[in-house]
Structures are given as structure tokens and as C-alpha cells.
Curated annotation (Swiss-Prot):
NCBIfam families: nifN
Keyword terms of this UniProt record: Metal-binding, Nitrogen fixation
PANTHER family: LIGHT-INDEPENDENT PROTOCHLOROPHYLLIDE REDUCTASE SUBUNIT B
Protein name per Swiss-Prot or TrEMBL: Nitrogenase iron-molybdenum cofactor biosynthesis protein NifN
Family: Belongs to the NifD/NifK/NifE/NifN family.
Keyword Metal-binding found: yes
Binding-site list for [7Fe-Mo-9S-C-homocitryl] cluster: 44
Amino acid sequence: MAEIINRNKALAVSPLKASQTMGAALAILGLALSMPLFHGSQGCTAFAKVFFVRHFREPVPLQTTAMDQVSSVMGADENVVEALKTICERQNPSVIGLLTTGLSETQGCDLHTALHEFRTQYEEYKDVPIVPVNTPDFSGCFESGFAAAVKAIVETLVPERRDQVGKRPRQVNVLCSANLTPGDLEYIAESIESFGLRPLLIPDLSGSLDGHLDENRFNALTTGGLSVAELATAGQSVATLVVGQSLAGAADALAERTGVPDRRFGMLYGLDAVDAWLMALAEISGNPVPDRYKRQRAQLQDAMLDTHFMLSSARTAIAADPDLLLGFDALLRSMGAHTVAAVVPARAAALVDSPLPSVRVGDLEDLEHAARAGQAQLVIGNSHALASARRLGVPLLRAGFPQYDLLGGFQRCWSGYRGSSQVLFDLANLLVEHHQGIQPYHSIYAQKPATEQPQWRH
């Protein structure tokens, strides 16, 4: 059982955390023809948009209620009503995500009251689904905001019927963690399809933010993703697969509304995790594991053999959201490596049961201090951790959100046998490249060739 060390500073130095609002927006972006609406100032939305565009290198649709000094004091329900009306009128979305920010939460807004006013004033837009999510910046993190949005999506868009289970016997729901990249989601979908099943990814970023050129020159809404109509059939699936411990609340909500049984997994990193994933698919489908996965498993075993010389007893420092940290720690632990510094931006229930001796809730300065004390040889974190890694004199494996200085990082596949093999190779290569050897000892009495004698000056 890990000891959770809470933040004890009055400020954040080199912040690790990305806000809950951004995480919730990412979940909404996984729905087809959707529009996330930030209830806050224009700067809140502009800041998040910069993060998303630099990470995905794609146009990202976001809107704002544009709170100002007056509405921040006197109330901003009118801003919400007007913003919803404008989006429905001009862009005709299939779904809108209404997300709070630190400003609106501090002001004391009531999303449900504002939403009721909108429904009352504009009955012509009663068929437009709106998902309200409370996501204050001053608590939680990117991952928890994403999880809160997924839970709200389930509670808002999935019908509450428990008599439809198995009506679509080949359909499987998949609740996807914030830390799964579009590449990870493609692997998950392909692995499910290889067993003759149909995946329903909730939400589906593999179709909306996978980095593709759309046929339309401009679209104000998301292109691709999970449609509202498809999401409504989640109660007819035969099973639900939950990837990521952070989605426990969303999984409970989906099971309660639909009665569909679920199976829960961590991140699909490493031999044991992928074995459990494929065996679950084999049990659900009744089909054997395809031969190609047996081959990929043997390749991962060979990769583990090749890299254990470098990774065994390696000292690593990890700064990431809880799901990602636990996934990497399990993979490294399977190779005999040690996590000497573990830092997360916010607490999570799953951290308590982890085998780590301690996990610190903090920032990248905390990571830097713990990594230096533990003599870490490698850092795993997002692009913000680069400066800390350079000061420590160790390499950085970029993972998580955001990755603004690495092209293609947003769509890399980390999951499965092949994804795990590549992670092991990358970690081993970084350690080999930055190997810090011990300078050989030369006795002061050793006789050296004349060419190596010191040049005396007179």
C-alpha cells in the first residue's frame, strides 16, 4: 500500500497538472459533431485551445461563454443561455458539452439552473443534447476531468433500461481513459474486431483526433468520433470493458443504467496486462486468440530478454496522471526496474493500492528533488518535464499530455504487445545513449609514455 504525500507548498513550481476542464473537453471531442463550451472567460478557452492545437496539431473546436468583470460578479447565466443559443443556431451540433472553469465555479454558477433557463426560452432546440459537467480548475487534474465528463456523457446520453442486455450479442462497450492515445484506441478496436466483436469506444478519439485530412475544407464541429445514436445502443451490448482505473465512477454509472456486466483493466502495458485483455476477449467472443497475437507475444518476450540488461535495477522517475503512472510502474516493475520518484498532479483512489512505497501529489519541482535524491537515471513525463530532466542530466521519455515538442507523439500506440515492446526498446536506448560510466583510475605512480608527460612551463 502506497503512502500518499499531499502537497505542502503554497505555490506550484513548474506545474505538472493540466486542468479538469481540458480533460472534460477532450472527452467531448471524442463524440461526433460535438462542441465543448467553456463557461468562463475568453482566456480560459484560448489557453486550452493552444494546448490542444500544439499537442494534436489539428484544428480543435472550442467555444466560450465569455464571462467578463460584470458577469463574474452579477451572475453569468445569461452568458450560458446566449452561448448555447448561438451554437445551436449557427453550428447545429449533435451534442454540446457545457463545462465549468475555475472562474465560473468560484463565482458560484449553477449549470443545471442555466440549462433549465435555456430549455425554457428556446424550446426549438429541445432535441439538442447538452452534457453539463462541473470541472473546477482548482481541484482534480486532466484525467479526473475526463473521467467526470465520461460519467456525465453516460448519465445524459445512455437510456436507463436494463432489459436490453445482449440484444446486440457481438457489440462490446469500451470506456477509454484520458491517457489512451488515438493509436492506443485503434489497437483496442482492432483487437476487439479480431475476435469477431464490434467495439463501441466511449469516447472515440481515434476517429476525431487521429490526425487525418478531412474531405471538407472547414468544419466548425468535430469530424469523426462516436455518434449520439451509437452511444444510445450501449445498453444492448454483451459486455463493457473499462480501460483505466480512473473510470470506475463512469463504469458504475453505465452498469447501473444498463445492467451490462463489465470487466476492468489498468493500462494495457506489459505481458500480464495484455494477456488478461486478450483472454477476456476470448471468453466474451468464444473464439480462440488469433495466431498473430501469439507471435507478437513471443516478440515482446524477446524484447524483454534483450532489454533486461539495461532496465533491470534501473532507477526511474515518473511524473504523470495516476492511470499513466500506474501503467508505467507496472511495466518497469516487470523488468526489475525501480520507480524512485512518483509524482501525480492530484490524488486518486487507485494510488493507495499500488505497490509503490510512496506517491507525492505535487509538481515537477517535487519530481526533480525526489529524482535527485533517488539518483534517477531516467524521467518519464510530458514535454513540460524536459527542463527538469536536463537539470538532472538524465534522458526524458515523453508520455502523457501535452507533447508539444515531439511530432506524432499524440498518436503513438503504447498498448498491446507491440506497443510494450517499443516502450522497452525506447527506454533501453535512452539509458544506453546517456550511459554515465565511471572514470578509470590512474595511479599517480604509473609510468606514462613521453607524449603524455605534463608540459612544464618555465
